[in-house]
Structures are given as C-alpha cells and as structure tokens.
Amino acid sequence: MDHLAPAFQDDCIVALATGAAPAGIAIVRLSGKRSLGLARRLAKLPEPMPARQAVLARLAHPESQQPLDEALVLFFQGPASFTGEDVVELQCHGGIKHVEQVLAAARCAGARVAEPGEFSRRAVRLGRLSLERAEALLDLVNAETDAALSAARSQLLGAVGRAVEELAASAQELRAEVEAALDFPDDAGEPPNRLAERALHLAARCQELLATHRVGRALREGARVVLAGAPNAGKSSLFNALAGEERAIVDEDPGTTRDCLEARVDLGGIACTLVDTAGLRGEGAGRVELRGMERARAELERAAVQVWVTDATAPLSGPQGDWLVVTNKCDLRPGGGGLEVSAKTGAGLDRLREAILERVRGTGQARASSGEVVITHRRHAELLASAAGAFARAAENAGRVPLEILGYDLAEGARALEQVVGRGVDDALLDTIFARFCIGK
C-alpha cells in the first residue's frame, strides 16, 4: 500500500495517545523503526526487550538524566503492531505538566511530534488498516449515542469493507470475462442479456448500500432540529421538555426568548441538536427582538427538521412548506389539530420524538448491530453512487456497444469501489481525511 503514502518518512514519531487531561495514567506512544532505540535513551530496558510484555522502568531525561517517572514500557514489534512499525508505549502518570516533560524528553531523544492522524496513516500505508476502517476509528471516538457507536464499531470491524470488496471482486470478475471475449472472439462467451443481468445486479447492490446513507449520515453527524413559531406558543417549554432540563427561561410575557438556545439530545439513536428560537411575528417587535428573529430565520435555514409550534388556545396556523406542525398546550384545549403535545404534562412528547426521528432518518432505522452494513460517510456514498452509475451504463449498453466500452464501465465501477477501502486514492484526499484526527491517533 505504498501508493497511499505522501513523502513518507522513516523517522520515529511520538504523541500522547490518551486524553490531554489530568488522569491516573497517560500513554505516550512512539512509532518507527528507531522507536525501541529511542526508548532505551529514556529508560534502562532489558536486552533483548520482550515483545508485548510490560516492563517496569524509570524514565529519565536523555541528556540531563533528571528522573521523570516510574513507568510501564511495552514494546510491539512490527509488523504486529497498530501502525505496522515497531511501537513503544510508555504508560506513565497522567498529570498535564508531567506528560509535557515526558514528551519533551522523547523529542530530545530524537522523536518527532506526530502529525494529526499520522499513527493511523502509517497503519493504512503498511496495510494494517484499510482506509474506511481508519475513518471508523475517528467515528468511534466521536460517537455520542449507542447507535452511532454501534455503526462505527461495525465499520471498524470490517462490515463496510467486506461488502464493498465483494462487489469490487465481482465487478473485476465480470470485466475479466469481457476482456477474455475480446482476446478470444471465437469462443462462446456470456450472451449480452446475461452480462446485462450481472451488471444490473451490481448496480442494484450498490443502491441497496446507498439506501442506508441517510440514516448512516444522521448517526455519524447528528441532526439540527429547530423549534419556531409565534411568540408565547410554548416553544421554550417544549424545548425544556425535550431536553429533559430547564435550559430556557419560560414566562407568560411574549418575546421572552431573544436569542437561540441549544441542547444536545439523543432521539432514537440520533444525536440531535435541539434549537429554541425567538418568536416570529410581523408587528410590535423591538430592536433586540428583531435581531432574535433574524437569528431564528438563519437557524431555520440550517435545520434538518423545522418544527412549527402553535398554541392550542389560538387558531391553528403555520407557514407553507415542509414543516412538522406541533400544537402545544393540548392540556388546555385538546383537539386543536396537528400533532398535539403538552410540554406541561408530557402528553404527546413520545409521538413528537418519533415524528422528528422519521424526518431525520426517512424510512431507514437508526440502528446498526455489529456486522450490519450502514454507510455513514459521504465519501463512501459518493463512490457507491459513481459505481452504481457505471454498472447501470454497462447493463444498458450490453450488446449495443463494443465490448471495450463495456469493459471500461465495469473497470470504472470497480475503481470507485476500491477507493472506499483506500486503493487508488490520492495524497490530497488522505491529507483531508487524517487532518481531522487528533495527534495521538
């Protein structure tokens, strides 16, 4: 997988692999062919150093010999390590200043501070991780809900990669048969209708995977749900009820909410950002309230779901468009129309949560059990769409165009699928992907 590396260096890199906060234990990780030699400059280690066995050692600065810590040192000999290179982990005490000194000592010994995601990038380069599994590592760290964690874990364990590799192999097999027919035209090959069926099956399978992307993207990125409506419709009360805590000030006077408030909530496995906004009205608003209304309209433009909250004691009204219309205060006057809820009693809140979730995920389900294939990344979805288009063209043109063109379409589809797992991608894309990682990953 050397084609994945930018000007890849054989130097030794170092970074904190655990969180940058006070903790009982911190793990400082070194990777590179000189990592064990550098570790010996920091601590007296046995010769030979046993692999995968913890060795208790005293760390000291390589030049001043000032004692630093008593740590556990573990050596992972490449290629049987995370990066595929020799890796040394120093398990030391986790004070922030203390870890800074250990890292400084490692740099003094000859290590270079790792770039963001460089450990994972080296693992991809040396074939320890496929690209989509490396992406799943970041998703695993950032997951906010059980469902998002399950989707990330499934991808990390190879569910997406296996599905895509299987499709790519089938496409390459079909392409090889087309090329064999070109090389040996007198031999009886697959009839055009059979070639079309097989290409169409590949396209359909790509579309099946693509159909999971709407819910997959919501699992990974979350969704923005904005509550809007006239002043005093009960938006802030509803916001507090959905958030499960008193975040917004509630008062009988209209126009109490002047700015936008946010709360992160788990709705059926989707991490939703719930936004409370200033009431929207045409007349009577002061200067500050008008600014709040401007911010409310800006939030609505960003929303994945727009919820229009009305008051059950007032005539049912709502804007035109694809809004989820909710009638609040149904405890005061039931039968007001729309989706009836009461922020005060909690009536209808479960139905509201489900209605929001349906709009976020469409017909999919916000669940991803271990091994289930869910497409969470836009990059993967775009490549699957490209592959589906290429296979569909091949199916449509079978028997109508020269076999060379058919083979080209099949090859194009296979290449798109292979890029999902990292084959044939360029350095600029890798730079973009791994720049999102923290330094220790």
Name each model-derived stretch.
Residues L274, V309, V326:
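Generic enzyme active-site microenvironment
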Residues F75, A278-W308, A312-G318:
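Switch II of P-loop NTPase G domains
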Residues G24-I27, E89, V305-Q306, Q320-L324:
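Short active-site oxyanion
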Residues L56-Q77, G255-G284, V305:
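Switch I (G2) and immediately adjacent beta-strands of P-loop GTPase domains
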Residues G127, N232, D276:
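Conserved G/P- and acidic residue-centered "switch" motifs that form tight phosphate/ATP-binding loops
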